């Protein structure tokens, strides 16, 4: 008999019910649980799968370049970035009638197209690409990298090319190579690209392989580098009247510290960006030579951690035992990596709009909104994943003997204090913030808006003032016109920063008031509650007073049977599951706030946000309802328009979201009865009963139904808001 799916678990393969299929899919990537897995095969499988991941990423990015080159309007967009709509790709749909064809034929195209809201046009333009041929070249190169990645993945599964476990656990070598090779060399290479291709491109000089060695990016070449006159590279920067992509108003500097934004493109100065990447390259190239490998010099990670004992002896044994704990636990390493990546992704969201690096992207409002929202949601999923793998570490990999009285053990020892403090903070934030909002709602409902409780964010305004924002009148640090910091700032460092901070046309340090104070605390409530659920899930993963033997039941278990009351919903997986709802909720508030604040800024009516954001009805009526008008009227008996697809997606997103509750609210018994009735009917229906299946149909397990419900809730929620965001922004600003 042929091997049945799943081949990695013979026990599951022999299951006579449909559970075999769903559990097989659920555990396909849990290599640790597979039959006859060894530590060596585990590491090798994960290593090989990374190359597959890279191949997919390169193929996807290649596809972006290829479709824009083939079906887009990059060359005409380059000529007029502010008025031509960038096309992502063509749409072919047999359902389109003539009105639809006309509605979606935009951006100078000959047929229906999708408009690009990803910012890739601005990025490619900034880094020096100018023609469709450039895009095709990039697409081919990435396709080549994709093929190389696939070959590398296959190669590293062959016996002669499989790395050993000791190679995977050589932390110092990995750190050195990742710091120097991955970050250092790539940052240096990127600096080279910016200096040799992008900066000349921004000054109207087209540099490619055929003239790459003939065009000096700086008139004196490398002379200032070797003579120690590095400051020459910053002299004669582009002027404030520089027209991007032309020589008009351009300078010769390549590495500057101007600060602020290019007046025409509203993006960071390319020469500042090149300088930044050079500094990053230098730091990481040095950092990549810090750890001891073949030559007996440098730090040993183990020695560093063993030596890190807090003074006074009141904090236990510090980091003793951590090296082996981390180095032998893939879940711990993954948890750390996801936590770092999650924070970085959220920082990307914050900085892409406040300090835009790509030419003209600040004036593409829909892309700005889409990119912010996209990166915040991605960050949320990655961060919750960090805690999930932290909890799995505690269940599968944590060894109490190896970690006696170190920081990990002490976290577990103090978990009641940690969890109760987080609980207290969440309760305080929740009751006070909601109390203020509801009080203000009631005052408006009773016709006495002057009785609202409005709190000025004095401390936050003071911090903004310290960084140079003068409108609050604090006269402190950089906003004090006669202070030494202010005077130094005008000449020595970042002279453009102060003018940028005080220019109301960008998103740097937006003016804040009582509405911002309230929504910041609502977001703080969401962050603390999400953290509470995640931290509790990880710290209670091994056991709690209620269920001391919890670790023996694994990461995800529904309950310990009917005989032991109160053990349902307390697995570490359940904590992750609940936290994702809170995470989505919190990021909802974050993106609502960002979007509404910016819509009013871009429309020039900031008073609408300031007046309506201090009470809940204001958010519901003046943000959600008012901005959804295009979606609830996207197509009607009188015809359709280019927003119709978003109106349809808005409805579809609601449908997916609502379907989630079907899985979340009704449990297994209901579905089992329904399935058995349907199977009975199927077997007695002519023609239909010719189709048979081997597996007995059974309802999803409790945990699986929750996962399916959560997936529908998350996807539907994001689809719905994405449609709302893009339609409401593009409907106003194009």
Swiss-Prot record:
GO MF terms held by the record: 4 iron, 4 sulfur cluster binding; chlorophyll binding; electron transfer activity; magnesium ion binding; oxidoreductase activity
Record function comment: PsaA and PsaB bind P700, the primary electron donor of photosystem I (PSI), as well as the electron acceptors A0, A1 and FX. PSI is a plastocyanin-ferredoxin oxidoreductase, converting photonic excitation into a charge separation, which transfers an electron from the donor P700 chlorophyll pair to the spectroscopically characterized acceptors A0, A1, FX, FA and FB in turn. Oxidized P700 is reduced on the lumenal side of the thylakoid membrane by plastocyanin.
Family of this protein: Belongs to the PsaA/PsaB family.
Protein name: Photosystem I P700 chlorophyll a apoprotein A2
Membrane-topology descriptor: Multi-pass membrane protein
Positions bound to chlorophyll a B1: 654
Gene: psaB
Keyword NADP included in the entry's annotation: no
NCBIfam families found in the cross-reference section: psaB
Binding site residues for chlorophyll a B3: 662, 670
Domain of life: Eukaryota
């Amino acid at each position: 008999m042929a091997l049945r799916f799943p081949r990695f678990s013979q026990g599951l393969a022999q299951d006579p019910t449909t559970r075999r299929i769903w559990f097989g899919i659920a555990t396909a990537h849990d290599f640790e649980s597979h039959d006859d897995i060894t530590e060596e095969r585990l590491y090798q499988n994960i290593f090989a799968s990374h190359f597959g991941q890279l191949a997919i990423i390169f193929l996807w990015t290649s596809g972006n370049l290829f479709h824009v080159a083939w079906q887009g309007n990059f060359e005409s967009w380059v000529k007029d970035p502010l008025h031509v709509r960038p096309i992502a790709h063509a749409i072919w749909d047999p359902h389109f009638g003539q009105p639809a064809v006309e509605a979606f034929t935009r951006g100078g195209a000959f047929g229906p197209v999708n408009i690009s809201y990803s910012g890739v046009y601005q990025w490619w333009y900034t880094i020096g690409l100018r023609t469709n041929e450039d895009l095709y070249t990039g697409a081919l190169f990435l396709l080549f990298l994709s093929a190389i990645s696939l070959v590398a993945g296959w190669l590293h599964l062959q016996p002669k090319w499989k790395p050993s476990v000791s190679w995977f656990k050589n932390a110092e070598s990995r750190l050195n190579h990742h710091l120097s090779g991955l970050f250092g060399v790539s940052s240096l290479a990127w600096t080279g690209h910016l200096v040799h291709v992008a900066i000349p491109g921004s000054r109207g000089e087209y540099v490619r392989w055929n003239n790459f060695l003939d065009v000096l990016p700086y008139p004196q070449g490398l002379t200032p580098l070797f003579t120690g006159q590095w400051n020459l590279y910053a002299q004669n920067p582009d002027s404030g009247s520089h027209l991007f992509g032309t020589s008009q108003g351009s300078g010769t500097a390549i590495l500057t510290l101007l600060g602020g934004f290019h007046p025409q493109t509203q993006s960071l100065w390319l020469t500042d960006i090149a300088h930044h990447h050079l500094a990053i390259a230098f730091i990481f190239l040095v950092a990549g030579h810090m750890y001891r490998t073949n030559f007996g010099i440098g730090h040993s990670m183990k020695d560093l951690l063993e030596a890190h004992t807090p003074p006074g002896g009141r904090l236990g044994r510090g980091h003793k035992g951590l090296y082996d704990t981390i180095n032998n636990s893939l879940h711990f390493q993954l948890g750390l990596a996801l936590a770092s990546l999650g924070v970085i992704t959220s920082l990307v969201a914050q900085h892409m709009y406040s300090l835009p690096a790509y030419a003209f992207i600040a004036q593409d409002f829909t892309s700005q909104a889409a990119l912010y929202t996209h990166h915040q949601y991605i960050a949320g999923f990655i961060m919750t994943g960090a805690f999930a793998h932290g909890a799995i570490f505690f269940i599968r990999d944590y060894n109490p003997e190896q970690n006696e009285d170190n920081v990990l053990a002490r976290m577990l020892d103090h978990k009641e204090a940690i969890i109760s403090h987080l609980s207290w903070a969440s309760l305080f934030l929740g009751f006070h913030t909601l109390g203020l909002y509801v009080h203000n709602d009631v005052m408006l409902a009773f016709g006495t808006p002057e009785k609202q409780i409005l709190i000025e964010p004095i401390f936050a305004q003071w911090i903004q003032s310290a960084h140079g924002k003068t409108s609050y009148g604090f006269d402190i640090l950089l906003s004090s016109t006669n202070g030494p910091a202010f005077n130094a700032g005008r000449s020595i460092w970042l002279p453009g920063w102060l003018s940028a901070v005080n220019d109301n046309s960008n998103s740097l340090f937006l003016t804040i008031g009582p509405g911002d104070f309230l929504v910041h605390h609502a977001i703080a409530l969401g962050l603390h509650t999400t953290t509470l659920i995640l931290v509790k899930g990880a710290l209670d993963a091994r056991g709690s007073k209620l269920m001391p033997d919890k670790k023996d039941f694994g990461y995800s278990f529904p309950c310990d049977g009917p005989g032991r009351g109160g053990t349902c919903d307390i697995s570490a997986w359940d904590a992750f599951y609940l936290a994702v709802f809170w995470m989505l909720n919190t990021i909802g508030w974050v993106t609502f706030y960002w979007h509404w604040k910016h819509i009013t800024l871009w429309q020039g009516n900031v008073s609408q946000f300031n007046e309506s954001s201090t009470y809940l009805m204001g958010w519901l009526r003046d943000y959600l309802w008012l901005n959804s008008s295009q979606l609830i009227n996207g197509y009607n008996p009188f015809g359709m328009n280019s927003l119709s697809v978003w109106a349809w997606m808005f409805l579809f997103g609601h449908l997916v979201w609502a379907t989630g509750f079907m899985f979340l609210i009704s449990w297994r018994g209901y579905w089992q009865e329904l399935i058995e009735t349907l199977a009975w009917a199927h077997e007695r229906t002519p023609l239909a009963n010719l189709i048979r299946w081997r597996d007995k149909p059974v309802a999803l397990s409790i945990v699986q139904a929750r996962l399916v419900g959560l997936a529908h809730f998350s996807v539907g929620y994001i689809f719905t808001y994405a449609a709302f965001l893009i339609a409401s922004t593009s409907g106003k600003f194009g």
